Design a protein with these regions (language model features):
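A structural signal for alpha-helical segments
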Residues: 17, 124-132, 170-173, 177, ...
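Active-site core of glycosidic bond-cleaving carbohydrate-active enzymes
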Residues: 22-53, 114, 187, 194, ...
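Acidic/histidine-rich catalytic neighborhood
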Residues: 89, 143-216
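Conserved functional hotspot residues or short segments at active or partner-binding sites
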Residues: 137
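Helix-terminus loop motifs that line ligand-binding clefts
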Residues: 2-14, 40-114, 120, 127-131, ...
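Short, histidine-centered active-site or binding-site loop motifs used for metal coordination
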Residues: 12, 28, 163
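Solvent-exposed loop and edge beta-strand segments that line ligand/cofactor-binding
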Residues: 14-24, 95-109, 166-179, 273-287, ...
């Protein structure tokens, strides 16, 4: 419990699945318990992520971004991204099977910061913030600040080519969960920059020095964050239906009856009948995505719209991940 050099593997102690790597599972699904019941363990988990800043900065740089881009799969604190890029071979074509989560499933960066802020709000642990928290928030916001794309024809910033929580949909634009969580990460950074400038001048000076080494400044970052937040596209509920699009073009996807797959005794049975490319073109999700967003940020729409989105997306979710039903159950309450 006291060793902040390691996190919690996705399968915990139940098996060797995922090689013991830490995913967003830690901050989003495991962390809330520790935050309330054993806050000292919650802090240790966040310290693990702080120690992983080296690897997160390394990943950002390797992908052409600034700041800290947390790995989708994390192992030792200095390793950076450890998600395998090739996971096997297509037995029909002989082509390698590519795993894109380590490259374009990027919401984990803001998931970590969301958990960090929840911890601070619940515990008031100022020592943690002074030692680690402010730096983590600012460095991850620098990533998002460099990640946003200005789309001239839409007159807004967007986040294109990602995987959201629903991993059956790859290379999507403006995944609602990703965009909202990135916006929150940026908002918190602008807030804490103002805070440390006024109240934590030593920390402000430390971070300013770090920015200057990168050829920028906290003032410039704060200004850019405030500007980009106002122009970042946040998908809104449809005026007629109240449904938030999971990503651009979601409502144009094919609809099929998923009941036979939802009621199967094992997961993944949809792939007995359809290829991954087929499922990519269907309103068929692996796990909570919009419902995950409504769980994390329940105030982004009205209770009536929230209920409509729950009904709409649950019918289109296969719950092929063990992370899905718990979130649906909580949100239903």
């Amino acid at each position: 419990k006291e060793d902040n050099r390691v996190g919690i593997g996705a399968k915990a102690l139940s098996g060797e699945g995922y090689k013991g790597h830490s995913f967003w599972d830690t901050e989003t699904f495991i962390f809330p318990y520790f935050q309330m019941a054993e806050p000292e363990v919650a802090r240790t988990l966040l310290e693990f992520r702080y120690k992983g800043l080296y690897g997160a900065r390394k990943k950002a740089k390797e992908n052409g971004y600034k700041g800290a881009m947390y790995p989708w799969e994390a192992a030792w604190i200095s390793d950076g991204e450890v998600t395998p890029y090739i996971t096997g071979v297509n037995v029909h074509t002989g082509e390698p099977l590519i795993c894109l989560t380590g490259v374009i499933e990027q919401h984990i960066t803001s998931d970590i910061i969301f958990a960090l802020w929840q911890y601070y709000t619940a515990t008031g642990d100022q020592d943690f913030m002074d030692r680690y928290g402010y730096e983590m928030i600012i460095e991850t916001a620098r990533f998002w600040n460099s990640r946003l794309e200005w789309i001239e024809e839409n007159n807004r910033y967007e986040i294109r080519d990602v995987i959201g929580p629903d991993e059956y949909k790859e290379h999507v634009d403006n995944n609602a969960y990703t965009n909202y969580m990135a916006h929150e990460n940026m908002r918190l950074a602008a807030q804490v920059i103002a805070c440390i400038r006024d109240e934590k001048k030593d920390i402000y000076g430390k971070m300013q020095k770090l920015m200057q080494e990168e050829g920028t400044s906290l003032e410039q970052l704060e200004e850019e964050l405030k500007d980009k937040m106002k122009k970042l596209y946040l998908p809104q509920p449809d005026e007629k239906t109240g449904i938030i699009p999971q990503f651009d073009g979601y409502f144009d996807l094919k609809e099929i009856d998923l009941s036979v797959y939802k009621n199967a005794s094992v997961v993944g049975t949809i792939f007995h009948d359809y290829s991954g490319e087929d499922v990519q073109k269907m309103q068929a999700g692996k796990q909570a995505d919009i419902v995950e967003l409504l769980y994390q940020m329940e105030d982004i729409t009205t209770p009536d719209n929230k209920a409509k989105n729950y009904v709409y997306y649950e019918a289109r979710t296969l719950h092929d991940s063990s992370l899905s039903k718990a979130i649906h159950s909580i949100t239903a309450c």
